[in-house]
């Protein structure tokens, strides 16, 4: 997995340091502070997850539950798009729905109704956050045009390496290490897997996916997950033998904890309305694909 990752477009084009990330967001930083943008990161991930869940329950897609990997891929697409574009360039609600639609294709998920994503975007926002979704058109063509634009901005880099697989591989390695060194099996290993998987999913609400390799995020999620269970000391002997950059690991862990601290203090129902009130209106309507093709040279 590690070898495949380091040769991938993910590793070569979509890993940045913190300074680069905030520099690329310069246009939106004229509107939002870093803390406000970090709160928006939490909101956008929650919004995309909510739209995916709502679509799974819609009549058009009954019984079609989106896998977590589809949701995770959509969130990554969304974050990457807004490294190269600002909120003023294209409606983020439309980009979020488009990212989900594209992720379903890339992750080879069952084809979903295009109209459902538009419809459920309009349902989810007022129901959960009290925010209205305004679009000039509800026609399917709007979504297809925005899909073309999204692919263009992403440089057709659509394969995303997630932290879930390396996290499970690392957990298995730790389990075997513990059994070999202590002759005692790990207690409640299934609960540990569940907790660490939850942390991995939560990392989508901050920027670690734009900064660190999947194995680093997976290892950080294990460390945080075990600490949250009050069992962090059980990892100490094993961590000494893990071949990784400990400074990057510590940075990743710190960012996850910072995200959790911010999330706990984030009153979404009230604060999202204020954040959305500051959201810039797109400069122009979404141009047709051929016009976009001549405008972007990425």
From Swiss-Prot:
UniProt KW Cytoplasm keyword: no
Protein name: Cyclin-C
Species classification: Eukaryota, Metazoa, Ecdysozoa, Nematoda, Chromadorea
Main function: Component of the Mediator complex, a coactivator involved in regulated gene transcription of nearly all RNA polymerase II-dependent genes. Mediator functions as a bridge to convey information from gene-specific regulatory proteins to the basal RNA polymerase II transcription machinery. Mediator is recruited to promoters by direct interactions with regulatory proteins and serves as a scaffold for the assembly of a functional preinitiation complex with RNA polymerase II and the general transcription factors.
The keyword Transcription regulation is assigned to this record: yes
Region of interest (Disordered), residue spans: 278-298
Organism: Caenorhabditis briggsae
Keywords of the record: Activator, Cyclin, Developmental protein, Nucleus, Transcription, Transcription regulation
GO cellular component: mediator complex; nucleus
GO BP: positive regulation of transcription by RNA polymerase II
């Amino acid at each position: 997995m590690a070898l495949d990752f380091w040769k991938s477009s993910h590793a070569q084009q979509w890993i940045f340091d913190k300074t680069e990330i905030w520099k690329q967001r310069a246009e939106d930083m004229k509107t939002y502070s870093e803390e406000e943008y970090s709160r928006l990161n939490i909101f956008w991930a929650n919004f995309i997850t909510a739209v995916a869940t709502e679509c799974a329950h819609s009549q058009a897609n009954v019984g079609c539950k989106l896998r977590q990997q589809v949701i995770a891929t959509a969130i990554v697409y969304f974050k990457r798009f807004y490294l190269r574009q600002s909120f003023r360039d294209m409606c983020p609600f439309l980009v979020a729905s488009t990212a989900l639609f594209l992720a379903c294709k890339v992750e080879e998920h069952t084809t979903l109704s295009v109209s459902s994503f538009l419809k459920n975007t309009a349902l989810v926002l007022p129901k959960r956050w009290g925010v209205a979704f305004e679009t000039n058109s509800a026609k399917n063509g709007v979504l297809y045009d925005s899909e073309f634009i999204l692919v263009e901005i992403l440089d057709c880099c659509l394969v995303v390496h997630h932290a879930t697989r390396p996290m499970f591989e690392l957990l298995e390695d730790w389990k075997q290490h513990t059994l070999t060194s202590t002759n005692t099996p790990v207690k409640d290993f299934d609960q540990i897997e569940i907790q660490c998987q939850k942390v991995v999913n939560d990392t989508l609400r901050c920027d670690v996916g734009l900064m660190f390799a999947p194995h680093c995020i997976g290892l950080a999620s294990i460390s945080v997950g075990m600490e949250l269970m009050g069992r962090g000391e059980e990892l100490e002997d094993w961590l000494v033998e893990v071949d990784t950059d400990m400074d990057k690991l510590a940075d990743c862990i710190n960012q996850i904890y910072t995200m959790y601290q911010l999330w706990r203090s984030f009153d979404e129902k009230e604060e999202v309305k204020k954040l959305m009130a500051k959201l810039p209106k797109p400069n122009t309507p979404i141009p047709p694909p051929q016009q976009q093709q001549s405008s972007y040279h990425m």
